[in-house]
């Protein structure tokens, strides 16, 4: 099984460089790794409740760990055991499937590129920053972190004049988690009238949490990305999981590419396990709180989890650091070694027809971990207060820049603003703020 050569194409032809024999995805990896946006992740906090502690993870270390897990998932998907379920579904020999499908797996360079890039569009102060920018862009296409990642890769990062990092199609396809336009999936734009009678200082996260998709501003590059797909594949790729039944319902697309499915599993595993580790180490969660998850895990369908969760829990909260690391390693290994192949029958394009997945009983375990982190870490009052403070800061900062941009924006940003249309001017201010780290946003706010 071969991959269409169009997936290795770039929007702009790369200038030739003497003796540069790197394959396309290694070039992509290098561009992401050396970008300013990637470096900025070192100053964006993964969990805001953690506070000042040398142990905690940043968005940068999180991305490195996601890359490591992603590479391990690719290795798992080369093993014959990962084809058992697919072979049963298709009534084919798993050795034959292994021989065919190994050829379409991403290289380590490619999967690391996706994992390095997956968070680079996320704004300062997490969900609070995202809500602030979505509210301030409510009349101009909205804001969402994954959409900003695509925009940064295809337009903003100054590797080319107008094509961002000028990455290969396949790399960009792997980064797109939600192949739709944001203003179609985001509920605020489907209530008839956008509510404006709210003091921007008191915008509720529940009212302005964005949907998922690509900015309409970046539609041209999105359409170029999907050119190799048949009309049927393109239509199916953008299909939602269900139709909107309430005005405030966020819509999500149903399908992802093979590479994206691997990256997203790696991200979920890192979030569920490593963020839990951070929270345990610095005391954000207690052994008593963890028992609520243990009770659910003890009743799940995974035999290994049922048998080991008691001893794993003791190790997770042990004062002996090596015991906790062993427990974390065992959990990560459990998730990785259960990844298997999945088929989406409606597609003809191999990169969409096949995905990575976890069995239902393992997803059940992963979701218990994710819900615990969400409930006791992300929704922790300290996290929410920091994110709310950041939300107010970014909202006010946007208003300040919008009031006198030529005076207050950096020179290059101000020049771009001056040449832009009214809608594009708002997006330029949004791009500038979204690219800030937590610490830099705080410094700029204090200067203003």
From Swiss-Prot:
The record's listing under SMART domains reads: HDc
The molecular function terms in GO held by this entry are:
dGTPase activity
The annotated regions of Basic and acidic residues compositional bias extend over 11-26
Q: Where is the HD domain?
A: 59-272
Q: Does the UniProt entry include the keyword Hydrolase?
A: yes
**Is the keyword Hydrolase assigned to this protein?**
yes
- Report the family membership: Belongs to the dGTPase family. Type 2 subfamily.
Q: Which keywords label this protein?
A: Hydrolase
| Disordered as annotated region, ranges | 1-26
Instruction: List the PANTHER family.
Output: DEOXYGUANOSINETRIPHOSPHATE TRIPHOSPHOHYDROLASE-LIKE PROTEIN 2, DEOXYNUCLEOSIDE TRIPHOSPHATE TRIPHOSPHOHYDROLASE
Q: What is this protein called?
A: Deoxyguanosinetriphosphate triphosphohydrolase-like protein
Matching InterPro entries, A to Z? dGTPase (IPR006261), dGTPase-like (IPR050135), dNTPase_2 (IPR023023), HD/PDEase_dom (IPR003607), HD_domain (IPR006674), PHydrolase_assoc_dom (IPR026875)
